[in-house]
């Protein structure tokens, strides 16, 4: 029960903060005007009191965007975890991989998207690569830092008893890196959504990314702001879910003393 209340409290607090920033932004820039700058109440009215077709369009777009974000998240996190493990096992791999990852991170994804579309088409492969590029670098660095922080004495003890480097990684480094792993997961959740939106803006023409893009030339600002609000809500819920899973895992490893 406490975990459920903590989860709901985190969602409520994050929602209040987002609404405060939203209202504060509109108040700080009154030149935006009420036609363009939709308030939370305007978006609520659009979602609740609007036409069923409007809600259906947003729901369909959200399902596609969550699918795209999930694909990019899974590919990016898998690559980050595998790359960080290889970097721990092989200094040569780390010296080669880190500069390449840094180079890819320094290139704006918007400039890479047309190349990805031309190379891989507008399907899920392009979506997976786009999302993975956003997710990979921060997750890779965070997880690698956590693995490097594993107790050296315990790692040496495993080796002294005949354990391989892989055994030391599995038994010592990975459990020690769980806080860093969950930090990487929390960082990557909004990143995966951003990657999905970019892929939809510039590639697939589906999902909420496409809905936002099409709303601008139609001056359909209620739909634009509603799409942004739905994406923000999905990001808050996903971020908080990762935190809830982290707490469960922490209780599993550390016992009931975890706050």
What is each residue range found by the language model?
Residues 91, 148, 225-259:
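C-terminal transmembrane helix and the adjacent membrane-cytosol boundary/short C-terminal tail
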Residues 102-138, 145-146:
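Generic hydrophobic transmembrane alpha-helix motif, especially the helices
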Residues 129-133, 165-199, 225-226, 238:
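Transmembrane alpha-helices
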Residues 68, 210-235, 239:
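Pore-lining and gate-forming transmembrane alpha-helices of multi-pass membrane transport proteins
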Residues 1-25:
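N-terminal signal-anchor/first transmembrane alpha helix
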Residues 142-187, 208, 212, 251:
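Short cytoplasmic-facing helical segments at TM-TM junctions of multi-pass membrane proteins
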């Amino acid at each position: 029960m406490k975990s459920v209340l903590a989860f709901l409290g985190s969602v409520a607090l994050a929602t209040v903060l987002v609404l405060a920033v939203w209202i504060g932004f509109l108040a700080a820039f009154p030149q935006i005007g009420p036609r363009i700058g939709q308030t939370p109440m305007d978006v609520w009215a659009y979602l609740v009191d609007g036409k069923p077709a409007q809600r259906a369009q947003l729901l369909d777009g959200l399902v596609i965007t969550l699918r795209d974000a999930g694909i990019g998240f899974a590919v990016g996190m898998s690559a980050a975890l595998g790359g960080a493990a290889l970097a721990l096992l092989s200094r040569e791999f780390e010296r080669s991989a880190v500069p390449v990852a840094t180079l890819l991170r320094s290139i704006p994804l918007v400039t890479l998207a047309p190349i990805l579309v031309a190379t891989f088409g507008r399907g899920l492969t392009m979506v997976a690569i786009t999302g993975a590029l956003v997710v990979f670098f921060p997750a890779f660095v965070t997880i690698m830092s956590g693995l490097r922080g594993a107790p050296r004495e315990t790692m040496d003890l495993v080796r002294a008893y005949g354990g391989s480097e892989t055994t030391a990684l599995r038994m010592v480094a990975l459990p020690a890196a769980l806080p860093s792993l969950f930090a990487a997961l929390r960082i990557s959740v909004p990143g995966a959504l951003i990657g999905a939106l970019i892929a939809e803006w510039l590639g697939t023409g589906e999902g909420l990314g496409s809905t936002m893009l099409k709303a601008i030339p139609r001056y359909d600002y209620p739909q634009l702001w509603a799409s942004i609000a739905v994406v923000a809500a999905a990001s808050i819920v996903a971020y908080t879910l990762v935190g809830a899973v982290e707490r469960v895992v922490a209780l599993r490893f550390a016992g009931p003393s975890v706050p």
